[in-house]
């Protein structure tokens, strides 16, 4: 299956952006140059191959791409095991447990551009669980869904402190009870789990 590497939100030259026709096939390679010469940000990479991007991403060709800079490091944000990239997506899981992507019965329009699943995955897992310590965590939130948007809130009724969005840190932290993410959108937030 052919693929194209694209880092969503990266500032790169046109030859390295992973345009849809710049595909390579299994057994071959292509060298991209990512200078990472931009502010700290939560980006994500995904396939971008013409006509099959939706299928390759549906199959799991995506991931977090985190940029850092001195300004961000000076903020002493939670890091290491206390920094969690969380990539959300929905998938349609058939009765036999296999992934299913809807197909069009219209030969003039073979693509199904918007597909909604019956299950939400986080980092490729159904119903993931992580035990947290009573401290602050940094959540790098990414919506890798085809069409679904998410409205996230915490059952503990604690706020998110949003510190970043698609292209990096916000001018000032923003306390929010809910974070909304539309397809390909990112948010960077800190949550304090102390006292739970």
Residue positions per predicted region:
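Extracellular/periplasmic metallocenter environments
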Residues: 1-73, 175-196
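Residues in well-ordered beta-strands of folded domains
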Residues: 6, 66, 87-89, 121, ...
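Histidine- and aromatic-rich segments of cupredoxin/plastocyanin-like copper-binding domains
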Residues: 12-20, 100-196
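Short helix/loop capping segments that flank catalytic or ligand/cofactor-binding pockets
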Residues: 15-16, 55-56, 75-76, 94-97, ...
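Extracytoplasmic
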Residues: 29, 60-62, 81-83, 115, ...
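Short, structured patches in soluble enzyme cores that scaffold and shape functional sites
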Residues: 36, 49, 69, 88-90, ...
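Low-complexity, Pro/Ser/Thr- and charge-rich linker/hinge segments at domain boundaries
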Residues: 68-84
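Conserved, well-structured core segments that form or line functional sites
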Residues: 86-108
